[in-house]
Amino acid sequence: LHLSLRRQRQMCIRDSMMQNLQQERLFLALGAVAHASGALKHTLDYVKSRKAFGQELSRFQHIRFELAELATKIQVTQSFIDDLIPRHMQGEELTREVSMAKYWASDVEFEVCDRCLQLFGGYGYMSEYPISRYFLDARVQRIYGGTNEIMKELIARQLGI
C-alpha cells in the first residue's frame, strides 16, 4: 500500500510538472512572437525614415520582399499559437504541439531579429539602436524552457520515433 501511494504521488507531481512545462513553453512561444513583432515594427519605422541612393529604404523591392516574408512568418506562427491557447486552457495534453510552438516561434524570432538587424547595416550592431538588443534577447529564447534540440526530441518521441 505504501508503494502504491508513493507511486500515485510521483505520478501527480510528474503530471503537474508536465502541465506547467506545457504552459511555460506556450508562454515562451507567445513571447517570442511578440518580441519578433516588436523587432519588425522597429525595423519598419527605420526603413521608412532611412535614405540610401536618394530614396527611403522602404522603396527598394528587396527590402519590401524581406519584410513581407518576415511579417508572414510572424503571422503564421501567431495563428498556430492562437489555436493552442484555448486547447491548453481546456486541459488538453499538447506536449507535441507546444514543443513545436516553442521551437518554431523562437527560431522565427531569431530569424526576424537577425534579418532586421541586417537591414540596419552597421547601425544594427551598435548598442544605441534598439535592434541590437532585440537580436541579443532573441538568442536566449532558443535555450531556456528546454533547448530547441530538446523540443525536437520531444516532438520525435510523440511521433513514435
Give residue ranges: language-model regions:
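Single conserved hydrophobic/aromatic residue that forms the stacking wall/gate
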Residues: 1-13
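Alpha-helical interface subdomain recognition
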Residues: 19-161
